Amino acid sequence: MVDAVVTVFLEKTLNILEEKGRTVSDYRKQLEDLQSELKYMQSFLKDAERQKRTNETLRTLVADLRELVYEAEDILVDCQLADGDDGNEQRSSNAWLSRLHPARVPLQYKKSKRLQEINERITKIKSQVEPYFEFITPSNVGRDNGTDRWSSPVYDHTQVVGLEGDKRKIKEWLFRSNDSQLLIMAFVGMGGLGKTTIAQEVFNDKEIEHRFERRIWVSVSQTFTEEQIMRSILRNLGDASVGDDIGTLLRKIQQYLLGKRYLIVMDDVWDKNLSWWDKIYQGLPRGQGGSVIVTTRSESVAKRVQARDDKTHRPELLSPDNSWLLFCNVAFAANDGTCERPELEDVGKEIVTKCKGLPLTIKAVGGLLLCKDHVYHEWRRIAEHFQDELRGNTSETDNVMSSLQLSYDELPSHLKSCILTLSLYPEDCVIPKQQLVHGWIGEGFVMWRNGRSATESGEDCFSGLTNRCLIEVVDKTYSGTIITCKIHDMVRDLVIDIAKKDSFSNPEGLNCRHLGISGNFDEKQIKVNHKLRGVVSTTKTGEVNKLNSDLAKKFTDCKYLRVLDISKSIFDAPLSEILDEIASLQHLACLSLSNTHPLIQFPRSMEDLHNLQILDASYCQNLKQLQPCIVLFKKLLVLDMTNCGSLECFPKGIGSLVKLEVLLGFKPARSNNGCKLSEVKNLTNLRKLGLSLTRGDQIEEEELDSLINLSKLMSISINCYDSYGDDLITKIDALTPPHQLHELSLQFYPGKSSPSWLSPHKLPMLRYMSICSGNLVKMQEPFWGNENTHWRIEGLMLSSLSDLDMDWEVLQQSMPYLRTVTANWCPELESFAIEDVGFRGGVWMKTPLHRT
């Protein structure tokens, strides 16, 4: 990944030299020399990345170069911080004057001298590497084709090809089973064959959903214990029990399933330790049609779980026709799966033949080509690269790994760093997308291009990996926005191997720059890794980290730490004391404390975190106060205080954080002692705003137009939980959201009729609308538009609105572009084309949803 490290560094250096020339004048010569050498070396670094896999000398040289660039980048940040480059103009001006102080001269000289030494060492590495690459000149540097080709996911991961027969067969087994017996089925086959996909198709089938009162999905990693598996089953049943012993857990499972027809899927079971199976198997109730599906790569596992041979399904490779169809669905996803260029069809079929019918391989190569230019010479180059990777393989598994290696090799440089962060997460872990994106921004992996903001560019990176089928979507919102994801275990194997060789991360936590915190964390891993750049909570759903306060003291030894995510953690001391220690980490750019306890307030010492760009304290229910020093974080891009129920208001001065792109959980003050809504109008870079409005006096009359000129704002969420008073309804009704708004969410709205501005005339660009909970009974007349004015809404969600009355036909007439409607717990919407709308509800879809 040295090409990724160099690319990120060059981008930062270029920006600093162009925009901050005065503050780096002491080091300008060294930076320019460094920039020149690295630009030249970019021309062969990608080839060096490939060749180092078989050349020990090259591997060592590339590793040395990577470490030198890391050090140069750290010096660069030190220079910026020392010169006051934190976005605060007054501080920057004063800091520049302080550079003239005699006490500063030795420090400046030391940094300048070290940059000079790094330059000399890099020049030497260049001379040693050059002989491996002939005819290389700086003009040979190619661009990363497809880097910005798609800014949102294009390929629909729910599309399934060639597995209809498999699904039909399994459903027949389930429906014909003897209810008096426990049915055990096994899906057996190599990784990447589609076992999990078949199980998901069956699990999510409507007929299966109606037949089984309880459906449970458990991802069984190689390191799972019987206790973890039992707790996972209980979480599927809505029970987040803690502290119980195994016997109690098993009895609870029995109680939940007794008298119910149930289906349990045990996905990806390995044969290393199956002692857990006997207890669970013996404890499962019989006599009401219970069924268990086990997916595994091992025939011995199928026998061990007592799956009869006639109930063991062995998926076959895809046929040539289905292989081509799946490839087209991915590679030509932007063209509805149609290949319209004969020259691409020929080379495409040649590539598909090399995939040998393996779905994971086909999707990986198809996703790669989706993101490349659709021209013959580029596809021919990829075909030859693929052939090189396949050479010498002796098994189907080798072929899958070769396709994944090809996909990694062909990634744009910055996406290589992004994908390697997934090496930190445990097997089968469901990963929050925002955690990934925030970490990428904090570490500087995200390239801001084509006028895209930092957060938008971070989303683009995620889409780039999703379109390449390297990340699998787990959960989406009604609007198609991805919430959580995961990676296939074979993709995980690849990124762990690369990350370990490049000292990015290491499962043993040694000699690396990134660590994942999960469960009871071994603090020694921090002690032996003082060069850490990222520490991320990788706890699985429903679990927490239990950390002690001594950990904070060890964090302070990692002075170059950029990302610290200790979300979903419980500490044995007040978190303010721990944050007091963390405040010394001046390179810190991303700090996540989401769902961390006990956090009551931030310490004043946090004012020293001048490099902070992302601060996430969402779901900290005990947080009562934000220190005024938060307004000093002039680089802040994201401030998330969602669901901080005890927080009274924000401090004055939030309006000075003009780089903010995302502000969530914002509670306008009820008095002049805190931040008023009027300050928000200064945040002209806002893309996403979440308001918490509970009292009418949070908004003054003269503040009602505070949102109208936020020209970049795309999403607004208004949460009125625990509100009272007609005055609040009047104030919300008089607000003026900006016309270009793309997505709107109303939660716990107290009014009986919709706000007057909720109309296609006032919000002509609105694409997604969500109204959840509250007292809404009807929509005001402007909501329905007229024959000349219609909504452009594509996605609508209505939830927990017990009194809302709305006609389905009238709704469709006013929303002609509607593609999907999600509705539940809305008993008065009887005319809707959604089954059980008054209870669990469902989704109506006109056509497959594509984000525009």
From Swiss-Prot:
It comes from the Eukaryota. ADP binds at R149, V161, G189, M190, G191, G192, L193, G194, K195, T196, R297, K363. Disruption phenotype: Increased sensitivity to the pathogenic biotrophic bacteria Xanthomonas campestris pv. campestris (Xcc). Reduced resistance to Pseudomonas syringae expressing HopZ1a. Changing I136E: Reduced oligomerization activity associated with a reduced ability to mediate cell death as well as an increased sensitivity to the pathogenic biotrophic bacteria Xanthomonas campestris pv. campestris (Xcc). One of its GO terms (biological process) is defense response to Gram-negative bacterium. Changing P816L: Lost ability to trigger cell death in response to the Xanthomonas campestris effector XopAC/AvrAC in the presence of PBL2 and RKS1. Impaired interactions with RKS1, ZED1, ZRK3, ZRK6 and ZRK15. Its main location: membrane. Changing L465F: Abolished HopZ1a-induced hypersensitive response (HR) and loss of resistance to Pseudomonas syringae pv. tomato DC3000. Exhibits autoinhibition activity. Residues 17-68 form a coiled coil. Changing P359L: Lost ability to trigger cell death in response to the Xanthomonas campestris effector XopAC/AvrAC in the presence of PBL2 and RKS1. Changing K195N: Lost effector-triggered immunity (ETI) in response to the Xanthomonas campestris effector XopAC/AvrAC in the presence of PBL2 and RKS1. Abolished XopAC/AvrAC-induced self-association. Keywords: Cell membrane, Coiled coil, Leucine-rich repeat, Membrane, Nucleotide-binding, Nucleus, Plant defense, Repeat. GO terms for cellular component: nucleus; plasma membrane. Gene3D superfamilies: 1.20.5.4130, Helical domain of apoptotic protease-activating factors, P-loop containing nucleotide triphosphate hydrolases, Ribonuclease Inhibitor. LRR repeats lie at residues 558-581, 585-609, 633-657, 683-706, 763-786, 798-824. One of its GO terms (molecular function) is ADP binding. N-terminal amphipathic alpha helix form a funnel-shaped structure that is required for the plasma membrane association of the resistosome complex, cell death triggering, and disease resistance. Belongs to the disease resistance NB-LRR family. RPP13 subfamily. This is Disease resistance RPP13-like protein 4. It comes from Arabidopsis thaliana.
